Amino acid sequence: MRKRSCSKVILTLVLGFSLIWSSTVFAAENEQVTAKQVFRFDEQELEQGWALARSQKVYADKPLSNGVVRGKTDPNTYPTRRGVILVTADKYKDLIPLGHAAIVWTSTTVVESLTGGVVTGRNDWQTTRDTCYGVTTHGTTSAQDSQAASWCYNQIGKPYNFNYPDKWTRSRFYCSQLVYAAYKDLFNIDLDTTAYLSAVHPMELVNTSKTYTIYTK
């Protein structure tokens, strides 16, 4: 009887694990499909968007709250100030073939959302990316930009948001949605544009009238 009971327990555990695993795989597959469907854009439309980003004039970065800018003040100096938004047109593996975004945390660290969720990464895009845009928002001080970076930092550990049209959730994030959410929630600055419906594409952070470019590569 004991052997039979043990066998039933083991069988139940195995079946339960199998069901959980199957459900997880099914959900992941559906998330992948959602991402591909949402970001299946016309190549010409996509190139026009990045062409608009490349055409943006480059300005000097805003001063710190005390009126002083650390280091060089010339336009097109790679940004290391906390709260500067970074955008690249480079593909991220096969999952996000349409660019990536992050926000500067320190001179050596960014906060970003990758497939594993919100994490910190290396602030070395000037050497590791083929393309890079540094942008900052109109209407905020450098101290407020720092608050936005802190908001993003506080989301570390939250999972990746594969449901790209859902920019309103705060339980999970994709890269450009993370930056969008920080400025929307803190300062009611909407960095989304009319392009790509409700999804927030990384290039929109460059092309929106709410930001201006301080660095390009």
PLM segments and residue spans:
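Sec-dependent signal peptide cleavage junction
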Residues: 20-36
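Bacterial N-terminal signal peptides
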Residues: 12-21
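Glycine-rich catalytic cores of cysteine/serine-nucleophile enzymes that process amide/ester linkages
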Residues: 78-139, 160-170
